[in-house]
């Protein structure tokens, strides 16, 4: 849904950073989808400069991809604390244990702090719309929705600092239109 550029849809990749917002249990959450490839580094750096946390989504069968390294290195260097989402855990051949271990090894190789290495893990099936804190949970234990993911975001991403009564200030970073 967020990749609405014709080239992005054709190639199945994210080129331009996108954002959307959701409200979960009374909290406004801004979600930014960044490109993963080093060729789009400017977009990645611009987007990461505006966020308070990072959710790293890794396919349960494929594991970390080369582009995962690029974005993760940038996020860790900014001191962002990752939340790992192992997606497509219901896919045949899924290897969630491998993905968690590979992500830990990647974070360590990229110089993550001890605090960044102590990351929460959420297991999910994005296409089927559910998430869980339990690997290998089946049926009702999965939960009917993305509650586990959103609750993890609320628990682990720092709340925005600032005075809500202060005059509005904003920096325009991109303009886009979709019909």
List where the protein language model places each region.
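Conserved C-terminal guanine-recognition region of P-loop GTPase G domains, centered on the G4
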Residues: 23, 48, 54-116
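Conserved catalytic-core segments of large NTP-driven translation/proteostasis enzymes
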Residues: 107-179
């Amino acid at each position: 849904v967020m990749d609405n550029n014709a080239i992005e849809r054709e190639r199945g990749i994210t080129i331009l950073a996108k954002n959307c917002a959701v409200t979960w249990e009374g909290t406004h959450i801004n979600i930014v989808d960044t490109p993963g490839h080093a060729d789009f580094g400017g977009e990645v750096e611009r987007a990461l400069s505006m966020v308070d946390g990072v959710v790293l989504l890794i396919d349960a069968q494929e594991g970390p991809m080369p582009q995962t390294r690029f974005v993760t290195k940038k996020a860790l260097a900014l001191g962002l604390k990752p939340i790992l989402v192992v997606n497509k855990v219901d896919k045949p051949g899924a290897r969630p244990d491998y993905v968690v271990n590979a992500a830990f090894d990647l974070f360590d190789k990229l110089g993550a702090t001890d605090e960044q290495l102590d990351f929460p893990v959420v297991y999910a099936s994005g296409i089927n719309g559910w998430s869980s804190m339990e690997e290998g949970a089946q049926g009702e234990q999965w939960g009917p929705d993305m509650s586990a993911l959103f609750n993890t975001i609320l628990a682990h991403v720092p709340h925005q600092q600032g005075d809500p009564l202060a005059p509005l200030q904003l920096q325009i970073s991109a303009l886009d239109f979709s019909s």
